[in-house]
Structures are given as structure tokens and as C-alpha cells.
């Protein structure tokens, strides 16, 4: 495979994503490519895309194309909250995630942990649109009702687990690619049930939106493996959330920092 440069990747993305009413802006300092359509903007980090391309080839670019196209489609999608309560879900994002749209509309959001925030989304099938506070006023629906619908729908989602083990430490993965894998972190009944099944310390990670990792950690090797795993997923994710795992104790999630071969204090 020929070496992919920043310029080559920029040109390929522009070619693949070219469409009417769509503009491109390249930031040389940050190596980012911004795509704007009808007032909506998506920004891509080219070095990250190149790294994924070197691992996965054209599949990495296809994922980016899909992500951008679905994002613009979601932004233009019509949302009717009151008659479609079953389409409302909570989604987890980093605390640094913007709380306003580019047009100044404030997104409906709740605090969660020091590393994560809860937003609310309207499912559009292959993508979703974040719910804006102004939508609630237009449809005469409250924040409490949105929360109730969202968490009721979350509780109905299947949670298939794939297990892997390293030196007596078990790791469970949720990767359905339905857009709500990280959201399963908010399912309190699921977390409680998992805590009862595990014998070691329960540590969870949501490095990006399409994966939830649960570790049954028995020793320092387990923490080390989880730390490396979380960083790898965080670097590869289209929508990164946090590289810090969480310890689950007494129904609460506390972020921790793990160094190789050692577990640091919370």
C-alpha cells in the first residue's frame, strides 16, 4: 500500500464527499478538514484518518464517508418528539462536547461524571439527531419526560457480551454498532447485575460511542491491559469519548487514571 500523505488524504476525502451546496476548508495548522452544508459543519482530523487507513485500508475511508453523510442527513431530518417517544435515547459524550449547535441552539444535556455528559438524541434509523432545548418548547414536552422516555428505551436494548480473558482477568465487550453501545453505561440495572456476577473490581470504559468495555480486574496486569485497550479504542473511534476508565462501586462511577503496571489512586 502506497504511503498516504496528509495532502493525498485531503484530496481523496474532498473527491469522495463532493456534493452540491457543500464547502470544504482545510486548516493546515491543525491538519483538519471541515465540511459545511446548509449551515451544518463536520470537522475531520486527517492524521487520525490516515492512522486508521494504514490499519484498515479503504474500509477506514468508507466509514468516514458514511459518518459524514449520515451526519448531514441527521442534521436535516425532521423531528417530532411527542408522537415518537420510542425514538428517544440517551447518548454519552465527553464533557468537552459542544452544548450548542453551530447556529446557537442549546442541546438538551445532563451532567454525568467528571469525564462524561449525557445528551439526548432522536433516532433516525441509521443515524440520530441531538435534541435541542427549543424542540421541547415547540412540542410542549418537558425535560423530565424526555429523560423518562430515553431511559425506558435504553432499558429495552439488548446487551450482547463478548468475553476475552488475559491472565485471569476477564473483559466483556458491547459492540452492536447501533449507535448506543456507550449508552449502555447508563443502564443502572445492567451495571448492578454485572457487579453481582464479577469477582474482582468492576472497571468500565467508554473510549468511543461504539464500544463499552467491562473489566473484571483481579490484579495489576488487568489494569494494565485495560489501560492499553482503552487507549487503542479511543484513538480509533470516530466519536471519541474518554480514555479514562471508571471504577464502579456502590452504584457510582468514578474515573481513575491507570499507568502501565500500576493502578493509581482515584
Curated annotation (Swiss-Prot):
Family membership? Belongs to the UPF0354 family.
Protein name in UniProt: UPF0354 protein lwe1624
